[in-house]
Amino acid sequence: MKLIIFTGLVPFAIVSLIEAQAENEKACLPQYQVCTDAPGNCCSNLVCDCYGRYKSGTRIGRNCFCLQKGVIYKREN
């Protein structure tokens, strides 16, 4: 009887552990992906960098992207 209970509980415990681990390991956003709605989801070597969009001096929106930490981007003319 104990063997039947044990063999029933072991697969259940393994499946529960796998599901819990999958929830904790959410997929991170790779470089250059939009992170406006999820700023904490960039991969570990990236940071969610946000930029304001302006038209004729008036702010019209905001864009956020997963970019490399410590890298400065400059506009080219």
Curated annotation (Swiss-Prot):
Tissue specificity remark: Expressed by the venom gland.
Processing and modification events after translation: Contains 4 disulfide bonds.
Signal peptide interval: 1-20
GO molecular function, one term: toxin activity
The entry's keywords: Disulfide bond, Secreted, Signal, Toxin
Location of the protein in the cell: Secreted
Cellular component terms per the entry's GO annotation: extracellular region
Residue positions assigned to the propeptide: 21-26
Name listed for the protein in its UniProt record: U8-lycotoxin-Ls1t
Organism of derivation: Lycosa singoriensis (Wolf spider)
